[in-house]
């Protein structure tokens, strides 16, 4: 009888342990409601020209300042630039950012001479917590993408994981010290199949409970081919350390992946909500999605077994600044507002850092530079310096005159917020928008005006010619212009 009871207890305990690995759907829905950010604020950091791309935000707090590191690629295309460097910016309100300078620069003659894309380590993992970076042995730490190949990421040569540190003030721009060799490489004797092609972004967390047997837990994504299916993709794995310098790969890697050829699962950003760890991550080229890249989340009780969220994605392409890719999360909650930082890429392949929020926080004034377009069709952007004034409105009575103001479009006298921009204020009426521009007429060329609208209808007049009343709220209006007045 004792043996039978022992066997029953053993089966029950095993089942309970297995069941706990799956985060219940009800809890996943609670997490989604807590972290969703339906209001897109716009760009926070954008390059000043078309020969730089900004990527991979990491946001943290130091004293009364918010800081953000990000990586900068100094090329227009994938092969014409040298590679990544790491920069830092500061903010008072998480929305408006000032660039301070570099923290990881190119260094000639080293293993990482052309690629130095960094990610600060040991952040406070508590959701809504301090978001400060912890020190270990009197230093702040950072892992980074490193390599000698030029170009965007691993386009010419594999990338490895490097380690940097500083004893200085992390709220200032100064060069961090670095090791003379990578801490993880695809050539290591214990390198695993899922990372044999290249290694990418990494972030190190300080797990003082030593859940996996060591205090320092690195999540990193890497490229490799599955040994059984031969599917090529990016997956997320773990490495462990007791001293930040010597690392051992977790035997159960990869811990998180989506097995479809060419699919990317990466850039894990983890925070703890009560007894549940939440991993914000991005996926790209997922066959089940119509868009190319997006941000979503998974949850875990043990840092290893992750339950994927099956509901609506957190960030998807929906604006003219993120229409190609909206991906690579860094999420913080401060004073009751959730800020979701992500990398925004448009169809011109301009790349910057954008923000979405859980509450309406206004609209950013940061814009990408005008794209360079070299093809048979020449496109001239006419979004700047429009004069506008209201001619009639529901909140104004009787005859009135108001002074015109100069704005850049898109512009609205009312505020529109919410998913699909369906919720708006109470201002109804008519506004005038006027712009003077000159287009040189060339023989054999046709000229068009395209309007993307935010109102309901627009009556359009060009050079005194009335083009009529057009609905331009949902899509766009395309007008063919005469080449003679």
Language model features with spans:
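Bacterial Sec-dependent N-terminal signal peptides
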Residues: 1-20
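Beta-rich carbohydrate-recognition and catalytic domains
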Residues: 20-118, 122-201, 205-263, 271-324, ...
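Residues within well-ordered beta-strands of beta-sheet-rich folds
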Residues: 122, 219, 434-436, 448-450, ...
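Extended, low-complexity, turn-rich repeat/linker tracts enriched in Gly/Pro/Ser/Thr and Asp/Glu
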Residues: 288, 455-459
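Extended carbohydrate-recognition surfaces in non-catalytic/accessory domains of CAZymes
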Residues: 370-454
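Short strand-turn-strand beta-turns centered on an Asx-Gly dipeptide
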Residues: 461-467
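Short, solvent-exposed loop/turn segments in extracellular or other extracytoplasmic domains
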Residues: 472-476
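Conserved small/polar residues in nucleotide/adenosyl-binding loops
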Residues: 477-483
């Amino acid at each position: 009888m004792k043996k039978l009871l022992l066997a029953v207890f053993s089966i029950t305990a095993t089942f309970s342990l297995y069941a706990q690995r799956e985060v219940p759907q009800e809890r996943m829905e609670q997490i989604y409601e807590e972290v969703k950010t339906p209001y897109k604020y716009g760009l926070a950091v954008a390059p000043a020209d078309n020969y730089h791309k900004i990527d991979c935000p990491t946001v943290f707090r130091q004293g009364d300042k918010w800081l953000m590191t990000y990586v900068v690629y100094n090329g227009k295309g994938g092969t014409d630039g040298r590679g990544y460097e790491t920069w830092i910016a500061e903010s008072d309100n998480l929305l408006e950012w000032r660039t301070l300078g570099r923290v990881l620069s190119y260094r000639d003659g080293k293993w990482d001479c052309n690629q130095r894309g960094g990610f600060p380590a040991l952040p406070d993992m508590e959701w809504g917590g301090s978001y400060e970076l912890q020190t270990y042995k009197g230093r702040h730490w950072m892992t980074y993408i490193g390599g000698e190949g030029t170009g965007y990421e691993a386009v010419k040569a594999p990338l490895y994981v490097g380690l940097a540190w500083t004893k200085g003030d992390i709220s200032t721009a100064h060069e961090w010290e670095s090791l003379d060799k990578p801490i993880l490489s695809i050539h290591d004797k214990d390198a695993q199949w899922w990372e044999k092609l290249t290694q990418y972004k990494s972030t190190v967390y300080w797990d003082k409970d030593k859940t996996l047997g060591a205090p320092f837990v690195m999540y990193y994504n890497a490229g490799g081919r599955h040994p059984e299916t031969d599917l090529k993709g990016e997956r997320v794995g773990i490495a462990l350390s007791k001293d930040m310098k010597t690392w051992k790969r977790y035997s159960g890697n990869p811990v998180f992946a989506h097995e479809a050829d060419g699919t990317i699962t990466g850039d894990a950003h983890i925070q703890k909500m009560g007894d549940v760890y939440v991993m914000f991550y991005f996926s790209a080229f997922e066959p089940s999605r119509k868009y190319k890249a997006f941000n979503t989340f998974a949850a875990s009780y043990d840092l290893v077994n992750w339950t994927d969220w099956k509901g609506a994605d957190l960030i998807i392409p929906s604006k003219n600044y993120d229409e190609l890719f909206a991906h690579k999360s860094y999420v913080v909650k401060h004073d009751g507002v959730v800020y979701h930082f992500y990398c925004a890429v448009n169809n011109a392949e301009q790349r910057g850092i954008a923000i979405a929020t859980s509450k309406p926080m206004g609209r950013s004034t940061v814009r990408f530079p005008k794209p360079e377009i070299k093809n048979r069709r020449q496109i001239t952007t006419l979004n700047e310096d429009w004069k506008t004034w209201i001619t009639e409105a529901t909140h104004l009575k009787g005859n009135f005159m108001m002074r015109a103001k100069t704005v850049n479009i898109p512009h609205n006298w009312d505020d529109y917020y919410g998913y699909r921009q369906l919720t708006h204020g109470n201002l109804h009426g008519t506004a005038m928008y006027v712009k003077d521009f000159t287009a040189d007429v060339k023989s054999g060329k046709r000229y068009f005006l395209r309007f993307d609208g935010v109102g309901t209808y627009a009556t359009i007049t060009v050079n005194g010619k009335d083009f009529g009343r057009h609905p331009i709220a949902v899509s766009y209006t395309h007008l063919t212009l005469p080449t003679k007045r």
